[in-house]
Amino acid sequence: MGNLLGGVSFREPTTVEDCDSTWQTDSEPEPEQPGPAGGGEGQQHDEPEQPKQPPERAGGRPRASPVPEDHAEAAGAEQGGESTEGNAKPKRSFYAARDLYKYRHQYPNFKDIRYQNDLSNLRFYKNKIPFKPDGVYIEEVLNKWKGDYEKLEHNHTYIQWLFPLREQGLNFYAKELTTYEIEEFKKTKEAIRRFLLAYKMMLEFFGIKLIDKTGNVARAGNWQERFQHLNESQHNYLRITRILKSLGELGYESFKSPLVKFILHEALVENTIPNIKQSALEYFVYTIRDRRERRKLLRFAQKHYTPSENFIWGPPKKELPERSKAQKTPTLPASGSNGQTSTHKKSKDSKISPGASHVNSKSVEEKKGASREPGEEADKPSPEPGSGDPKPRNTEKDSAADQSDSPPEKTVPDTAGKGECPTSSEKDGEGEDQSKDSENPENAGCHAEVVAQQNATNPQTSSG
């Protein structure tokens, strides 16, 4: 199988998005998807559309890039600075995303180059060989190193043996796991028992204890002292990443989520280990193979992350451009119609249609008198001598005479400007249209007719 894979070239992921399918089928809500909840069996369902990695080197052995490991410590240091300043926005690490992409996909193009009868990791856990270069057996580590926090802190060669992976670590004496060795390890009760004891020992070193067989964890009795140490020793974040990976390789995928959830709670809610939150979100969460579990953890983290605008691990906002477009579309016509409406109102306030004056000249006149600004009559003189002092009683007579003497065809309202002749009082409120009346011959004839009627019915008005 390894030889077949070795001859196939796959497209290498080039961005964080290529490596991360957490929100691939879910942008906001949490759908219930059928499939396994974790473990290596669920890995094919996890990220089926993601590109795969080409061979790391000629022999086909997956190479553990030192960049992600260095970046893990750097990320922890940056997170420590952020916890004090609170202003720096974190960034997704492509190196971390690619490293964990390979892990979740069980190392594309992985090719075992060790003989199946080597089984160095299994033999170490069966207490048959010591780990190198120290020469210490697993039973001694579990019995004598337990609780010796100075030794566990400063020795950097045992962790690769206690939690083996299918990638090379910093201890080149440690051997990578093989697929055959993984299957044999899972079937060996002695090895599994010691592996769980090693896990408990390291949890206690971090101030955590395993409370049941399902992987649930809680604070240990020494949690305050150990959390303070964990918050200040970022290189232990890399150890936690290795432990989580190894749990998944050796059949304990279900133990990951409880531990990661506990760490996120302590970092984001209790604020006991705030410096770890960057590594927890960038590394620990993404060791989990099931997308649904990752989404649950990230939603929990997003709920408690501060400042909330700096949370960069949430679902992509794919609908955002459509929303902004939908908001802009009704805004433009609304503003345009408002502008037209206001212009229309101004024209109606300044001009009275002939049809409206024919129906109710008095009511229109009162409205015009109310809307007329102070000083309007002084600024806009009337062309008629007697129009500057209108009398309501004469105006009513003029309107009545106008209604009785007007030809039938002029009683029809005409919006085109060919309607009734406005009365002299209405002309007082039509300062801006008086010039138009003088230019219109029909309006000029109407003026003459109105003046003649006024002289005949009320001589005082023409002489005043």
Curated annotation (Swiss-Prot):
Residues 1-91, 309-464 are annotated as: Disordered. It holds the Pfam family OGFr_N. GO terms for molecular function: opioid growth factor receptor activity. Residues 327-342, 452-464 have a biased composition (Polar residues). Residues 43-59, 316-325, 363-382, 390-400, 425-439 have a biased composition (Basic and acidic residues). Residues 74-86 have a biased composition (Low complexity). GO terms for cellular component: membrane. This is Opioid growth factor receptor-like protein 1. It comes from Mus musculus. The lineage of its organism: Eukaryota, Metazoa, Chordata, Craniata, Vertebrata. The gene is Ogfrl1.
